[in-house]
Amino acid sequence: MAKGRTEIAELGEFGLIDHLTAKFQNKNKSTICGVGDDAAAIEASKDKAVVVSTDAMLEGVDFDLTYFPPKHLGYKVVTKGISDVVAMNAVPEQITLSLGISSKLSVEFLDDFYEGVEFACKEAGVDLVGGDTSASVTGFVINITAVGRAKKSEISYRSGAKEHDLICLTGNLGASYMGLRLLERERRVLQGLGDAVTPKFEGYEYLLERYLKPRARYDMVESLRKEGIVPTSMIDITDGLASEVLQICKSSKCGARIYLERMPLAKQTTALAEEMNIDPVIAALNGGEDYELLFTVPLELREKIVNLGCIDIIGHITAESTGAALVTPDGSTIALQAQGFTPKTAKTE
């Protein structure tokens, strides 16, 4: 009897991953953590682990070369790769890079791309140690594998959040998404007008940098360790705050309350959102690609977190039965919903 057809959109990104990997079970004792977290953790010695992550980026889905400079793209690829390692509270050390190269690309384009890769590697202190190249008939394809190390006792998984833990966030949200929307707007406006007209980016340079050249928060791993803080759970913001909170809740079997008035938004984010008639809260919740860190810590560490001065406490963990919700200033709650990848949204995420 023939199998029925199930559309990928019916499952969504996270449902698809669960579906494809449900039958896989770890067989090796050296596998500490497999599918289901930001990265895999593999035993390296009695007290240390190697952390490994891989990511793919496809032209026309994850980036548009009509407005993405190759140097910035190379930088962003490294950020995307090592951010998953950082989200495990590990220190990134090496990357490998494999490319599918279309005939429309030139050697000069690739030189610029690798210049961006080199700059990001130097900045983060990681080594490019290998990779592969192949021809592509579907545009530029990029795959990065990032490797890091950490003590087993210092790794933060998505599954460790406990009721009453504080929910903490580095940086601000929504800036990358608004940078993307700005680029898309100017591209549409300028189509067919020729090179004599320049795009209007003045006043929104920060948003462009957050989208085109984001920086992984590897600095926070060192800051947390200096304070003796090991997050009970952690994840990086790649699919938007709502998706990441729900991922922690799912893995930790808990609920969450995020307070709207505590969500950090940059001035340029709110200004452009108002100009484009976009709710900045939606940009923060579902925009993604901020590459900030969302993590939880026990309530008794509140003073240490506050003293760091670069982290916002935006909510707390609750019982699983309460679900995950956004709390508005008047005290009402709105259930959080994940965005993630679907074929309909792939070109704008």
Predicted regions and their residues:
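Glycine-rich anion/phosphate-binding loops
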Residues: C33, T66-I82, K104-E115, S153
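Polyanion-binding loop/helix "lid" in catalytic or ligand-binding cores
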Residues: A196-Q247
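Glycine-rich anion-binding loops of enzyme active sites
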Residues: M57, E93-E186, H316
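Extreme N-terminal cap/leader segments of soluble proteins
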Residues: M1-P69, M88, L97, A346-E349
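Residue-level signal for inorganic ion chemistry
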Residues: A41, G81, N89, L128, ...
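Short, compositionally biased
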Residues: G179-V197, F201
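Glycine-/charge-enriched secondary-structure boundary and capping motifs
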Residues: A2-G15, H19-Q25, K48, S102-D127, ...
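Small-aliphatic-rich amphipathic alpha-helix that forms the alpha element of a beta-alpha
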Residues: P70-Q94, E115-E123, S223, S243-I248
